[in-house]
Amino acid sequence: MSNSTSTPNTGLSYKDAGVDIEAGDALVDRIKSVAKRTTRPEVMGGLGGFGALCKIPKGYEEPVLVSGTDGVGTKLRLALNLNRHDTIGQDLVAMCVNDLLVCGAEPLFFLDYYATGHLNVDVAANVVTGIGKGCELAGCALVGGETAEMPGMYEGEDYDLAGFAVGVVEQSKIIDGSKVKAGDVLIGVASSGAHSNGYSLLRKILDVKNVDLTQEIDGRSLADAAMEPTRIYVKPVLELCKQVDVHAMAHITGGGLPGNLPRVLPNGAQAVIDEASWEWPELFKLLQREGGVEQFEMYRTFNCGVGMVIAVDAADADKTIQVLNAQGEKSWKIGHIQDNAESIEGADEKIRVIFA
């Protein structure tokens, strides 16, 4: 005869293992409206499919697809420490689409990867809202992503981000640096702050020197200045490309001016940067002062106030500045290109880019 006494159900569930499927579903429901605001006419279908479909925009004769992926580095650690999650998504989009822009590409769509130890729906929704804002600023569609709850891989609600962007450019209009020549003028376009690079050093300085994040610089707190989202240059620069023959562009990210300008210079070309042409924003002055950081170390770690550099013919320099400034981008002549027989491919960054 069987024992009729009921026993509690001791079977384990996915939730017991630390993965909350309902939380993931709740997040998807909350971000559908965000994705909808970013849609483009070329996008076929909405969120939720196994793959996102997108047509090539009309008007291209020989379209070339351009792809890129990036993250936001340890700026994410600062965001977690400050409990500020509303702008880090914009940083993620900016890092990807500004890279596509360098070759003249129009961003089409964006996908994100969000990995965490324990999914906090409110935090994740804030992050994705920032991603949506970034996509709107860049004119690209948020077509999907992946949210991975991985207990044991990340501490608590800590999370990591990665972004993936795809754009398109007319083959005959690809900007690859091949037109760069001696005498070209370099136009600097202002950054909004440290963008998303150099934050390991930035955080080290703040920590070692016990810097007060509430102190005011440039009319706002240091915390606000450090978390200012990366500027998205897509729309102003694409407009510039319609009006001016752009020879090359460099997105000033990790490696700063000396690390990124050589990536778009032809062999034998040397960039001469006029240090007196701009004043560093207060954030970088503070970091150099508090950390005792050498000048060249600053230049190869931070953008130092320059988020993008554009090379144009000297005859187009003034028009380039005029077009960019008219669209709200602060820009100026930052230097020029000269020939240098010693500047061979793969040469030391101090040779390829000199500061005068």
From Swiss-Prot:
Q: Which InterPro entries match?
A: PurM-like_C_dom, PurM-like_C_sf, PurM-like_N, PurM-like_N_sf, PurM_cligase
Residue pairs linked by disulfide bridges in the UniProt entry: none
Recall the GO molecular function terms of this protein's record.
ATP binding; phosphoribosylamine-glycine ligase activity; phosphoribosylformylglycinamidine cyclo-ligase activity
As recorded in UniProt, its EC number(s) are 6.3.3.1
Keywords assigned by UniProt, alphabetized: ATP-binding, Cytoplasm, Ligase, Nucleotide-binding, Purine biosynthesis
Q: Name the gene for this chain.
A: purM
Catalysed transformations (reactions): 2-formamido-N(1)-(5-O-phospho-beta-D-ribosyl)acetamidine + ATP = 5-amino-1-(5-phospho-beta-D-ribosyl)imidazole + ADP + phosphate + H(+)
Coiled-coil positions are none
Query: What is this protein called in UniProt?
Result: Phosphoribosylformylglycinamidine cyclo-ligase
* Family statement: Belongs to the AIR synthase family.
Q: What is the lineage of its organism?
A: Bacteria, Pseudomonadati, Pseudomonadota, Gammaproteobacteria, Moraxellales
Q: Which organism is it from?
A: Acinetobacter baylyi (strain ATCC 33305 / BD413 / ADP1)
